Every structure is written in C-alpha cells, then in structure tokens.
Amino acid sequence: MAHSDWGYDSPNGPZEWVKLYPIANGNNQSPIDIKTSETKHDTSLKPFSVSYDPATAKEIVNVGHSFQVKFEDSDNRSVLKDGPLPGSYRLVQFHFHWGSTDDYGSEHTVDGVKYSAELHLVHWNSSKYSSFDEASSQADGLAILGVLMKVGEANPKLQKVLDALNEVKTKGKKAPFKNFDPSSLLPSSPDYWTYSGSLTHPPLYESVTWIVCKENISISSQQLSQFRSLLSNVEGGKAVPIQHNNRPPQPLKGRTVRAFF
C-alpha cells in the first residue's frame, strides 16, 4: 500500500490526503483521542483472544513509510477472535508507528496523552471473506489490535524485530522472518477500548474494528531510534530516514467508544 503520492510531511502529509482520498474526511476515521470519561462500559463485551502460530511468521518488509512483519494467512493458524468480533480474524501483518521525538509517536491518544509509539496487528475477517484484499474495504472486513508504547525500559520482546531491521534498510527490501509469536508483544491486562474506525493511512478504508489495549508496553529510547534509522528511499537513493509516520487523531463524529475493563 506504499504510494509516493502520500507521506507524512508537506507537501503530501496527512492534512493533504483528502485531495486524493476523500474518505480522509469520513465519519469513521482513525486514529482518535480516547476520552475515557465518555467511553461506554459494555457488559456484553468479552475478552479478546489471540492464537498465533509462530510458524506463520514469514518475512519483514520495508514499505517506505514503515516496515511490516508479514504472516502466512492462507489458513486460520494465527487468529484473533472474541472481544467485539463476530468471527475469526486472521493475522496478516504487524507494524509500528513512531515519531521524530520520544514524546509523541503514537496514533491513538488517551485523554490527550500522547505515547512514544504504537504497535498495530492487522487481521482480516476470514469467517466472511477469502482474502485480505477482499476484506480490506468491507465494513466488517478488518480488526486491528493497537498497543500503545511508552518510552522507558528496553523491551527484550522487541529485540528479534529490531535485529532484523538492518536487512531491510531501504524501501522495497525484504528478508525472511521466521518463528515468531507476536502475542509476546501484548500487554498482560485483558482490558481494551473498541470502536469502529479506519486504516490510519491511505487508502483509509473505514473497515476496521479497533481494539486498543488499555495497558501499554515499554520501549527504550535507543530501541525507538532504531525505527527512525530505517530509510524511506530505495537503495542507492539519497538517504531519507523515516522520522515519523503517525497520523494525528481524527474527529469522533458521534461514534461510541466501548470499554472492556
């Protein structure tokens, strides 16, 4: 989904996306600021459950605006279910968002509080659709698990991912990434917020059931700087580090954010 017609800096930063992707001003855009006093405690919600098979981890790819760890998604070996979801959602990739400083790199904020980075685990509705591409534009097509990251102690669970970044320094590079269980990156608390939203970068489809974990995970300043050392240029081009790739919070426009605590 990496296109040179959009980015995170002017002249084609987030405020300009609407020119090419009118849905950027839609009613269900993400991320949002989660105002905890306005969330609705919903007793019908269940804890979400993940079952990830480490053998489905496949490769790591520099997509120009971030990097993705991709998973084999031809069967239901790695799935997210329960919580607010009607069926099984299959893991296709995870990626991170970060900022040019340690203070602010998250996409979601909580009561206006910004976090250092954010992990997104992207899943598609395999109970109803036959591929990520088919599901990605459908209202019930995707589920993304969001985990806020706070600068502090180094997180040893991130090390395997960080160690692989040298192999995908420039845009378009990919390398094998095997035997990894991303549930190791999740916080221990089952608490979450959920709402209807969108992909946070073009094509910005309003197809996402968001599950944002209430508890954050740690990342050190040094680990964060490794994200920023990735390059958005192809090999041989002028080195342009990916300094930041976080879209600002979007208007809620009457949506309800439900809480499972």
Swiss-Prot record:
One of its GO terms (molecular function) is cyanamide hydratase activity. Zn(2+) binds at H95, H97, H120. The keyword Repeat does not apply. Changing S184R: In isozyme A1 and isozyme B. InterPro entries: CA_dom (IPR001148), CA_dom_sf (IPR036398), Carbonic_anhydrase_a-class (IPR023561), Carbonic_anhydrase_a-class_CS (IPR018338). Changing D82G: In isozyme A2. Inhibited by acetazolamide. Substrate binds at T200, H201. The modification N-acetylalanine is found at A2. Keywords: Acetylation, Cytoplasm, Lyase, Metal-binding, Zinc. It comes from the Eukaryota. Its cofactor is Zn(2+). It is found in: Cytoplasm. It holds the Pfam family Carb_anhydrase. Residues 4-261 form the Alpha-carbonic anhydrase domain. Changing L158G: In homogeneous D isozyme. Its EC number is 4.2.1.1, 4.2.1.69. It catalyses: hydrogencarbonate + H(+) = CO2 + H2O; urea = cyanamide + H2O. Its main location: cytoplasm. Changing C213Y: In homogeneous D isozyme. The keyword Glycosyltransferase does not apply. GO terms for cellular component: cytoplasm. Catalyzes the reversible hydration of carbon dioxide. Can hydrate cyanamide to urea. Belongs to the alpha-carbonic anhydrase family. This is Carbonic anhydrase 1. It comes from Equus caballus (Horse).
